[in-house]
Curated annotation (Swiss-Prot):
It comes from Aliivibrio fischeri (strain ATCC 700601 / ES114). Keywords: Amino-acid biosynthesis, Branched-chain amino acid biosynthesis, Magnesium, Metal-binding, NADP, Oxidoreductase, Repeat. NADP(+) binds at residues 45-48, 68, 76, 78, 108-110, 158. Its cofactor is Mg(2+). The gene is ilvC. The active site is at residue 132. This is Ketol-acid reductoisomerase (NADP(+)). PANTHER family: KETOL-ACID REDUCTOISOMERASE, MITOCHONDRIAL.
Length: 494
């Protein structure tokens, strides 16, 4: 197999990267009806597999789980997840031949083996579904020409897919049809019905492509969504401890600060997040974020370049073939960082205190969101895709840090995201430590400005506000958030 994206000519690459259209609610008028009366078989029963299946069943679809015989015989967690929720569970050989739609929701590194195993069992004219297109785009999986290949990619962890559905809402979702596999022209009907079955149509669906989903998803998770949270947590904790701030307070400010700060981001973009600061703090955060953007732009661009070229995938798949030696080593190193081991504290931190004493975190979020967005759009990815993979998902990932620090983040995200996170953080951490943090004081991380006056120069404040509000991520964000007015509140601090 060879990288599918690299087999396309430049015009085809740009066309696929630029596929992104916000779909009208009317396009989902029939909701999941196209799949009713048909057999949906999910392979894999982890967070996405279980929660998508629960939603689809509640939407009136016939859902079952195909697991490896060993997983059934040994009653592994995937078997328990499906069985305890009342689903039909059986082997590949039993269920796959019955399926009209087979949905592969196993981890990325298992996709080639899973698809090669199930494809011979699939009946003529069936459909194969993915929630991430890595196997198709980066590994170049060749799929039988009689099979329709579709993607439904919820833009959040599986647990949120279920919780939002139970509220009568959903999560924003990318849907796509593989242009090489739509023999009957029914791909979009299948994808729309699957998305509606999960509830995604209520929050808004983007008509995308396998290529656009993969390239933007990899970029977001490696940089702002995971890598920046990891690097920022490590260097900020080190700075506070070195400058005499109590470890329990320092750790808690970071662990829950990311979540609280990005909650504001979720509802009103970078503009609202920055508006939560006093005027002097906003100006300071803006100045810091400008420094960070200048320092880190080459690193963001390198990650985008390596994703587009396929170099990232080649490197990661080489580690897969080497039993994940690098992944496991980096995971162990992360577990040994000072932030991961800070002592629990019952110190109370108010919501506003996370902003007042976490000015640096606000600066890092603004810089990271804008850098990721700019790198993606400069590479041909449309604004809508870039927004979802930079700003929109950030509160959801920050929520995992709040639960169990970086460990939880790296457990919840995919192995692909975790590997990319370490690649970024392993460079970003020493870069920040050596080139940025020496000039940072605890007035922006740990203690706050403590200003006696809220006075700032009017011209300076106007210029800062204009720069924040007129960034392209703010324009597209305002439009897309208008479709998600029923978003629930995630956090107000720990």
């Amino acid at each position: 197999m060879s990288n599918y994206f690299n087999t396309l000519n430049l015009r085809e690459q740009l066309d696929q990267l630029g596929r992104c259209r916000f779909m009208d609610r009317e396009e989902f008028a029939t909701e999941a009806d196209y799949l009713k009366g048909k057999k949906v078989v999910i392979v894999g029963c982890g967070a996405q597999g279980l929660n998508q299946g629960l939603n689809m069943r509640d939407s009136g679809l016939d859902v079952a789980y195909a697991l490896r015989q060993a997983a059934i015989d040994e009653q592994r967690q995937s078997y328990k997840n499906a069985k305890e929720n009342g689903f039909e569970v059986a082997s590949y050989e039993t269920l796959i031949p019955q399926a009209d739609l087979v949905i592969n929701l196993t981890p990325d590194k298992q996709h080639t083996n899973v698809v090669e195993t199930v494809m011979p069992l699939m009946k003529e004219g069936a459909a194969l579904g993915y929630s991430h297109g890595f196997n198709v785009v980066e590994e170049g999986m060749q799929i039988r020409k009689d099979l329709t290949v579709v993607m439904v990619a919820p833009k959040c962890p599986g647990t949120e897919v279920r919780e939002e559905y139970k509220r009568g809402f959903g999560v924003p979702t990318l849907i796509a049809v593989h242009p090489e596999n739509d023999p009957k022209g029914e791909g979009w009907d299948i994808a729309k019905a699957w998305a509606a079955g999960t509830g995604g149509h209520r929050a808004g669906c983007l008509e995308s492509s396998f290529v656009a989903e993969v390239k933007s998803d990899l970029m977001g998770e490696q940089t702002i969504l995971c890598g920046m949270l990891q690097a920022g947590s490590i260097v900020s904790y080190e700075k506070m401890i070195a400058d005499g701030i109590e470890p329990g307070y320092a750790g808690k400010l970071l662990q829950y600060g990311w979540e609280t700060i990005t909650e504001a981001l979720k509802f009103g973009g970078v503009t609202h997040m920055m508006d939560r600061l006093s005027n002097p703090a906003k100006v300071k955060a803006f100045e810091l974020s400008e420094e960070l953007k200048e320092l880190m732009r080459p690193l963001y661009n390198k990650h985008m370049d390596d994703i587009i070229s396929g170099e990232f995938s080649r490197t990661m798949m080489a580690d897969w073939a080497n039993d994940d030696v690098n992944l496991f080593g980096w995971r162990e190193e992360t577990g040994q960082t000072a932030f991961e081991n800070y002592p629990e504290s019952d110190v109370e931190i108010s919501e506003q205190e996370y902003f007042d004493n976490g000015i640096l975190l606000v600066a890092m979020v603004r810089a990271g969101v804008e850098l990721a967005f700019e790198a993606m759009t400069a590479s041909g990815i449309i604004d809508e895709s870039a927004y979802y993979e930079s700003l929109h998902e950030l509160p959801l990932i920050a929520n995992t840090v709040a639960r169990k620090r970086l460990y939880e983040m790296n457990v919840v995200i995919s192995d692909t995201a975790e590997y990319g996170n370490y690649l970024f953080a392993n460079v970003a951490t020493p870069l920040l430590r050596e080139k940025f943090m020496p000039s940072v004081e605890t007035d922006v991380i740990g203690r706050g400005l403590g200003e006696a006056s809220n006075q700032v120069d009017n011209a300076t404040l106007i210029a800062v506000n204009d720069a924040i509000r007129n960034h392209p991520v703010e324009y597209i964000g305002e439009e897309l958030r208008s479709y998600m007015s029923d978003m629930k509140r995630i956090a107000v601090g720990g």
